[in-house]
Amino acid sequence: MMSLAHSKFSCQRTRLLAVVLLAALWSSSLQQAAARVINDDCPNLIGNRDLYKKVEWICDDCANIYRSTGMASLCRKDCFFNEDFLWCVRATERSEDLAQLKQWVTILGAGRI
């Protein structure tokens, strides 16, 4: 016969296991969702996060300069392969870096459909 203390411990252990499993499943689904978003925008972001941050900085600066709602999103659209990004390069006075930025955008967007 099981003692009352052993029964309570077993119940607590089962609840703890259920919470841990749910947390693991939730975390896994969040990571998969984040990976899909990243892969949809910039297929080669994984392994090139430093390039992404350098290019993204242009969009952040542009949004800060003009305080325009959605400017950063427009700039990042299609993994920075758009006219808004080029406009932001000029607006942030980074035209001298345009060739390097275009190369980074090409690396980040390689494999993009």
Swiss-Prot record:
Instruction: Name the GO terms of the biological process aspect.
Output: circadian rhythm; neuropeptide signaling pathway
Q: Which InterPro entries match?
A: Crust_neurhormone_CS, Crust_neurohorm, Crust_neurohorm_sf, Hyperglycemic, Hyperglycemic2
* Domain of life (superkingdom): Eukaryota
A GO CC annotation recorded here is: extracellular region
PROSITE patterns assigned:
CHH_MIH_GIH (PS01250)
Cell location: Secreted
Which UniProt keywords are present, listed alphabetically? Disulfide bond, Hormone, Neuropeptide, Secreted, Signal
Signal sequence bounds: 1-35
Q: Does the keyword Signal apply?
A: yes
Q: Name one GO molecular function term.
A: neuropeptide hormone activity
Q: Which cysteines are joined by disulfide bonds?
A: C42-C79, C59-C75, C62-C88
Is Ligase one of the keywords?
no
In Pfam terms, one family for this protein is: Crust_neurohorm
Main subcellular localisation: secreted
Family to which the UniProt record says this protein belongs: Belongs to the arthropod CHH/MIH/GIH/VIH hormone family.
What this protein is reported to do is described as:
Inhibits Y-organs where molting hormone (ecdysteroid) is secreted. A molting cycle is initiated when MIH secretion diminishes or stops.
Please give the name of this protein: Molt-inhibiting hormone
Q: Which species does this protein come from?
A: Callinectes sapidus (Blue crab)
